[in-house]
């Protein structure tokens, strides 16, 4: 069993390096950040520079406040900096926050999330293989990638692209996690009964759709 720690909901930037080192020295396997009153990625950049073995992840970053290209860049750079230790944990948030706080569109969140993750993986594939970027969906279209904007595929070494985790509560979003993601993040209020009767069966449905 792995035991992970965290940097809290509002980490003090000046103390992140010390706290990350401390958690690694105490034997934690990973350290995670949340997107609340601060950016979730900056603390992990600092933690990556001051640790050697801790897995690093967001739990969660708000997916719909960004687009696939932005997330692909962030994920790529943190994976490179951490030498393969980064896990990109995403969540949808709820409609009022997306439309009123972030001023972004909200529609069909499960379908949009599936497409967002698929688009992000298509971008990573282009950067790693040199294949033409040709992603066309209902919500996102990415068809332009020139050498000037392409990261060096050697950045990631043998690590490959980051793992993608998805938070969910409802049945459809949970199915998306099973279908297109590498892991699932349960809500803190989720009960054992709900996990057993709703979450696990819907993860299985998603995995079956993907032939996993």
Describe the residue ranges of each PLM region:
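N-terminal beta1-alpha1-beta2 module of alpha/beta enzyme domains
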Residues: 1-58, 64, 162
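Hydrophobic faces of well-ordered beta-strands that scaffold small-molecule active sites
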Residues: 3-7, 31-33, 56-59, 86-90, ...
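Glycine-enriched alpha-helix->loop->beta-strand junction motifs that scaffold or abut catalytic
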Residues: 27-29, 50-54, 82, 176-185
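An acidic- and aromatic-residue-enriched active-site/binding cleft used to recognize and process polar
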Residues: 36, 61, 93, 189
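Short gly/pro/ser/thr-enriched loop/turn and capping motifs at secondary-structure boundaries
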Residues: 39, 63-67, 96, 192-194
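Internal, glycine-rich beta/alpha segment that forms the wall or movable "lid"
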Residues: 72-183, 190-211
């Amino acid at each position: 069993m792995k035991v992970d720690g965290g940097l809290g909901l509002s980490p003090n930037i000046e103390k992140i390096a010390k706290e990350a080192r401390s958690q690694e020295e105490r034997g934690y396997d990973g350290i995670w950040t949340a997107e609340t009153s601060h950016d979730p990625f900056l603390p992990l950049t600092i933690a990556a520079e001051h640790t050697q073995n801790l897995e690093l992840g967001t739990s969660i970053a708000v997916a719909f406040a960004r687009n696939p290209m932005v997330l692909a860049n962030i994920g790529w750079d943190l994976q490179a900096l951490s030498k393969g230790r980064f896990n990109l944990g995403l969540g949808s948030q709820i409609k009022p926050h997306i439309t009123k706080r972030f001023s972004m569109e909200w529609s069909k969140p499960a379908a949009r999330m599936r497409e967002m993750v698929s688009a992000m993986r298509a971008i990573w594939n282009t950067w790693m293989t040199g294949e033409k970027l040709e992603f066309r969906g209902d919500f996102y279209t990415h068809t332009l990638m020139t050498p000037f904007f392409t990261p060096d595929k050697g950045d990631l070494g043998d690590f490959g692209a980051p793992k993608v985790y998805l938070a969910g509560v409802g049945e459809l979003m949970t199915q998306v996690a099973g279908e297109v993601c590498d892991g699932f993040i349960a809500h803190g209020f989720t009960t054992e009964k709900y996990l057993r009767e709703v979450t696990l069966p819907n993860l299985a449905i998603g995995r079956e759709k993907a032939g996993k």
